[in-house]
Amino acid sequence: MSEEADHNRAIFCSSLSGNDPMKHFCALVLALSAASFSANALAAQPLLSPAELQAKLSDANVRVIDIRDPKSYAANHIPGAVNAPYGTWRGPANNPGELPGLPKLTTLVQSLGLTPSIHAVVVSSGADATDFGASARVYWTLKVLGLKELSVLNGGVRAWTTAGLPQNNTAVQVAASSFQPQIDKSLVATKEELVARVKSGDAALIDARPADFFKGDTRHVAASVPGTLQGAVNVEHDKWFAPGTSTFVSTDQAQKVAASSPIDPAKETVSFCNTGHWAATNWFAMSEVLGQKNVKLYAGSMVEWSKDPNGLPMANVPSRPKQLLIDAKFWAEKTFK
């Protein structure tokens, strides 16, 4: 609703007598309109430029979460940022994409002083497009926990530094919160759910990995079998960035990327990769930037899927001799590195 329309409605309502039945209706419409405007005005943008973030640093309700390693954080960081390294948001070594349990995540977000009223801004190094996946994965995790006021610093610390904005090396500690999150299952695709989806073919399965993974020419070191989900299409995670950077493109450009990709916004969509990292970028693009309402992330992704003892359906699985060659390559890299 436009401000002009609201103004005209207000004039009409004020012209009604106090006992006119329309008076109450008008008041209700105006209140709902104001609430809608207020919610839209307060809603956090999914992406913030360095200048936009700098303008918010004096706000006590803004919490900058630096997910780089402790050494990088200690050297220099955005003033006021707290450190929560990316690894603390991830699963175990044998299934790093696994969403940690609620008790662990509760302790983590409470230690950062997060509550629904805090605007959390996730910051990674900004090294490249792959690095953006870390910010997107933490953003997704926070949203899964019920937090709504969320943003990612577009371009990360590299963009902040390039902009010549201030940094310091003062470690920041914040008061813990008592926030008790709950898992929003509408954002999470489980392996069990995906088994049914693959069988029925009623969901769009988007593989965010580079083409050599999708085609089965290689695999993640923790995966058992190369290949992809049966029925999946490939939308590489780095399509959403200015070439050679971790700077996410404009919404208009993102719409063009989506239009040229095998993305069907009318279908429920599941984003996956090896460990739910690159997939988080595609989820972020579709759900948060483009506003698609029916996008889930399969956190365990191909590492979890390929290890299932029941041998779940896969496509682009190479021949046994080719798999042995891939295994030999991993062995050589590990042995002679």
Model-derived segments and spans:
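Rhodanese-like catalytic fold shared by cysteine-dependent sulfurtransferases
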Residues: 41-63, 70-204, 208-337
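N-terminal signal peptide c-region/cleavage motif recognized by signal peptidases
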Residues: 36-39
